[in-house]
């Protein structure tokens, strides 16, 4: 039982480390979104007079806003589902250990009651010493399970919070992606219009 409890405690700690990695990935995603937002603002300031040299950058921004955030968020959502499933499995294992301890304590109490009821004149010190040792071991096991339960509750709460935050960030990125596409469309139309106007003016002059 001790080895199994140690393994569950280690799994819980590993889960917390994974959630921290998940948080770091989300922060990286926010940084990417901020960079895209700054570039959007820069394009708004330039307006319809955007030089030709920015066309390649616009294409890169479009590809990044269209693919990269979506792929990363899909990966994050998959990790969230995996962590939620792992949380459920660890929680079930914890409940099984608690139930096993309750059964052990129940049988132990029955044996002690039978021993007291059927006791004969005999030295009581060995029985008391055994009772003390067994009780101490059980208390240690119960304390460790309580600690593990607290870790699991914190991990589950953290996992739920991260899932909610990822959904918010997904909505924000989708909105920014929509704005980027609108700006790209407007910029292209403006450039085409300017080009047509220049060609028309040139043809007028030549005539």
UniProtKB/Swiss-Prot annotation:
Keywords, ordered alphabetically: Coiled coil
Gene Ontology biological process terms, A to Z: negative regulation of hippo signaling
Protein name: Suppressor of IKBKE 1
GO cellular component, one term: FAR/SIN/STRIPAK complex
Pfam families noted in UniProt: SIKE (PF05769)
Biased composition (Basic and acidic residues): 189-199
Any one GO molecular function term: protein-macromolecule adaptor activity
Keyword Transcription regulation: no
Quaternary state and interactors: Interacts with IKBKE and TBK1 via its coiled coil region. Interaction with TBK1 is disrupted upon viral infection or TLR3 stimulation. Interacts with CDC42BPB. Associates with the STRIPAK core complex composed of PP2A catalytic and scaffolding subunits, the striatins (PP2A regulatory subunits), the striatin-associated proteins MOB4, STRIP1 and STRIP2, PDCD10 and members of the STE20 kinases, such as STK24 and STK26.
Family: Belongs to the SIKE family.
SS bond partners: none
Known role: Suppressor of IKK-epsilon. Associates with the striatin-interacting phosphatase and kinase (STRIPAK) core complex, forming the extended (SIKE1:SLMAP)STRIPAK complex. The (SIKE1:SLMAP)STRIPAK complex dephosphorylates STK3 leading to the inhibition of Hippo signaling and the control of cell growth.
InterPro entries: SIKE
Coiled coil: 4-32, 154-193
Domain of life: Eukaryota
Residue numbers spanned by region Disordered: 186-207
């Amino acid at each position: 039982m001790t080895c199994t409890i140690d393994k569950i405690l280690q799994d819980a700690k590993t889960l917390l480390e994974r959630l921290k990695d998940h948080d770091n990935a989300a922060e990286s995603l926010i940084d990417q979104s901020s960079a895209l937002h700054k570039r959007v603002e820069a394009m708004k300031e330039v307006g319809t007079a955007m030089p030709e040299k920015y066309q390649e950058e616009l294409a890169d921004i479009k590809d990044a806003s269209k693919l990269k955030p979506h792929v990363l968020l899909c990966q994050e959502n998959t990790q969230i589902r995996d962590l939620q499933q792992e949380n459920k499995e660890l929680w079930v294992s914890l409940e099984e250990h608690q139930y096993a301890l309750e059964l052990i304590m129940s049988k132990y109490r029955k044996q002690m009651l039978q021993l007291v009821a059927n006791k004969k004149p005999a030295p009581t010190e060995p029985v008391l010493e055994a009772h003390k040792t067994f009780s101490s071991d059980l208390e240690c096991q119960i304390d460790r399970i309580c600690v593990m339960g607290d870790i699991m509750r914190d991990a589950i709460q953290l996992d739920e919070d991260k899932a909610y935050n990822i959904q918010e960030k997904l909505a924000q990125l989708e909105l920014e992606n929509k704005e980027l596409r609108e700006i790209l469309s407007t910029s292209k139309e403006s450039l085409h219009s300017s080009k047509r106007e220049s060609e028309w003016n040139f043809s007028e002059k030549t005539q």
